[in-house]
């Protein structure tokens, strides 16, 4: 399972004209699910997202986690993170999980996040979404569990 974390001042996801998820300061995470991923992969990714130190302390060092700053978590499914881009000029998606598995694991990740953290929002799995964000830094990390 891949998670592309971006530290944001704010972010929102729209499907059509409807805002389906929004946060203020926090992290936006694009989530790519692969066929070999399991609930254990989701648990490992969630632990990293909530506890990885991406926010600055009073000395300006990235020393604080999402939990410590009380920021929002916005999860957005993105199957293109599992793309094979090594050859040619067109991505291959055979490394992406089938939609049923992807939906199941994304829903699991989201439900566990809502149990573990007070401010969680999400995009809509499988939808054509517009993601708006104000990067903070920018600070971006790629996790691969």
UniProtKB/Swiss-Prot annotation:
A motif (Gly-cisPro motif, important for rejection of L-amino acids) lies at residues 137-138. Disulfide bonds: none annotated. Its EC number is 3.1.1.96. Pfam families: Tyr_Deacylase. The keyword Iron-sulfur does not apply. A Gly-cisPro motif from one monomer fits into the active site of the other monomer to allow specific chiral rejection of L-amino acids. An aminoacyl-tRNA editing enzyme that deacylates mischarged D-aminoacyl-tRNAs. Also deacylates mischarged glycyl-tRNA(Ala), protecting cells against glycine mischarging by AlaRS. Acts via tRNA-based rather than protein-based catalysis; rejects L-amino acids rather than detecting D-amino acids in the active site. By recycling D-aminoacyl-tRNA to D-amino acids and free tRNA molecules, this enzyme counteracts the toxicity associated with the formation of D-aminoacyl-tRNA entities in vivo and helps enforce protein L-homochirality. This is D-aminoacyl-tRNA deacylase. It comes from Pseudomonas syringae pv. syringae (strain B728a). The lineage of its organism: Bacteria, Pseudomonadati, Pseudomonadota, Gammaproteobacteria, Pseudomonadales. The gene is dtd.
């Amino acid at each position: 399972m891949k998670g592309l974390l971006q530290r944001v001042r704010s972010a929102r996801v729209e499907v059509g004209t409807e805002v389906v998820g929004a946060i203020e300061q926090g992290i936006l995470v694009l989530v790519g699910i692969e066929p070999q991923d399991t609930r254990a992969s989701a648990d490992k990714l969630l632990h990293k997202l909530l506890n990885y130190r991406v926010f600055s302390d009073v000395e300006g060092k990235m020393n604080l986690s999402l939990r410590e700053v009380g920021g929002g978590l916005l999860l957005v499914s993105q199957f293109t993170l599992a793309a094979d881009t090594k050859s040619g000029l067109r991505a291959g998606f055979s490394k992406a999980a089938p939609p049923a598995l992807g939906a199941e694991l994304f829903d699991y990740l989201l439900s566990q996040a809502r149990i573990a953290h007070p401010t969680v929002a999400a995009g809509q799995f499988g939808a054509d979404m517009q993601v708006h964000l104000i990067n903070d830094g920018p600070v971006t990390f790629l996790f691969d569990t």
